[in-house]
Regions:
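Mature extracytoplasmic domains of secretory-pathway proteins
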Residues: 60-89
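C-terminal motif of bacterial Sec signal peptides marking the signal peptidase cleavage site
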Residues: 14-17
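Compact alpha-helical subdomains of small soluble proteins
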Residues: 75, 83-137
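Juxtamembrane extracytosolic/periplasmic "stalk" immediately C-terminal to the first targeting helix
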Residues: 28-30
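Sec-dependent signal peptide recognition
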Residues: 2-8
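Bacterial signal peptide processing site
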Residues: 19-22
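Low-complexity, intrinsically disordered regions in eukaryotic regulatory proteins
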Residues: 32-68, 96-100
Length: 137
């Protein structure tokens, strides 16, 4: 009888420990755009290959308009955050993005944010539906 009890207790502990854990809202990180010392919005990507991607692979900023990038970024940020909050691609997406579509970030910021999504697709193969076909390489 004792053995059966211990076996059931061990089985219960094992079952409880194997259930998927929901992300704790207190531990979630959110990337929030901030202004730099010059009062302009800026993004800092801490990946050495990102600079290479911007200079050698990404289309130049002159190929885009600010309104085009703003529209794409709204969709891409929504897609990114849905991946983050669902727990998919946790090894790639480590934080949510706090993006306000009513804020005027400027062309440079919108371009760099869009290229972050293109870079993640290029480097990790993450499917981002909001990218244009020419930016999916």
């Amino acid at each position: 009888m004792k053995k059966a009890f211990y076996l059931l207790a061990l089985l219960a502990v094992f079952t409880i420990s194997c259930t998927p854990q929901k992300p704790n809202p207190e531990n979630q990180t959110v990337m929030k755009p901030e202004k730099n010392d010059d009062g302009e919005w800026d993004i800092d990507v801490i990946d050495t290959q990102y600079d290479y991607f911007l200079n050698a692979i990404a289309k130049p900023v002159s190929m885009y308009t600010e309104s085009y990038l703003k529209t794409r970024n709204q969709f891409l940020v929504s897609e990114w955050n849905s991946y983050y909050y669902s727990g998919r691609y946790r090894n790639v997406i480590e934080s949510a993005i706090d993006y306000d579509p009513n804020e005027n970030y400027g062309l440079k910021f919108e371009y760099k944010l869009y290229q972050v999504f293109a870079y993640v697709h290029w480097k990790y193969g993450l499917r981002m539906q909001g990218l244009s076909a020419t930016d999916r390489r």
